[in-house]
Amino acid sequence: MKRVCFAALCLAFMLEACRNSTSPVASSSPTSSDISSSDQVVKAYSHFIPTSSPPTNLELVISPGFHINANPASFPYLIATEVKPGKADGIAVSDKLTYPPPKMETFAFADTPLAVYEGSVTIPIPLTPAPGAKGQRTIPFEIRVQACDHEKCYPPSTLTASLPIDLDAIRR
């Protein structure tokens, strides 16, 4: 009975999170002529799902026809995607993140394939609650990206995201 109640509670929480989520809904994709900086084609969303491991992740959504450099970038002169977690009382957030595997793409401006991210990219955020820490916390993030299309790259941007976390839900 306890498992059924717990499963129902988790499902209700996840449905509520989806209903209140800031997850992306495709609207119209920008065109190259409309773009003046990378933040116009890359959006950052945070997700807290207490039943996953880790329970937190950051999702970058890149508009169709664009890409961002992977981490690590293919060459030192390329600007790699970089996530910098901020501080939150009662939570230790690792600054050593594991970035997803890139897609290797060939572009007219490069002699060799480049490591890039396209579409949706999920970056797990490992965290450790401090002993005895309870309640709600919010972790701020800065995400450095440089968006490119098949012909050129746009000025880099630093995106921000906030990740609300319920420490009590993680410990259940």
State the predicted function of each range.
Residues M14-A17:
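C-terminal motif of bacterial Sec signal peptides marking the signal peptidase cleavage site
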Residues K2-A8:
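Sec-dependent signal peptide recognition
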Residues M1-K2, R19:
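N-terminal hydrophobic targeting signals that begin at the initiator methionine
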Residues R19-R172:
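Extracellular/lumen-exposed scaffold segments
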